[in-house]
Amino acid sequence: MVSLMKLWIPMLMTFFCTVLLSVLGEMRKKRYDRKELLLEECWGKPNVKECTNKCSKAFRCKDKNYTCCWTYCGNICWINVETSGDY
């Protein structure tokens, strides 16, 4: 009987710890509006240096003057510049 209890205690502790960690992790996530997750296309041709300035996973930029948009090099933080029609 005692040996059976020795097996169940670590299993129960592991179960409760994993359940609590998953619940606390879910509470920490911030919910974003659907409009916040929509990306615009970057109008212009970013160079290699600008392609290294990546957005966060929540499509946010560190600098408020920049917006997260998508290009051929991925999602980058960039000041959108309208092109003059040189396609």
UniProtKB/Swiss-Prot annotation:
It comes from Homo sapiens (Human). Although this protein was isolated in a region containing several WAP proteins and was defined as a WAP protein, it does not contain a classical WAP domain. GO terms for biological process: antibacterial humoral response; innate immune response. This is Protein WFDC11. The keyword RNA-binding does not apply. GO terms for cellular component: extracellular space. Keywords: Secreted, Signal. It comes from the Eukaryota. Residues 1-25 form the signal peptide.
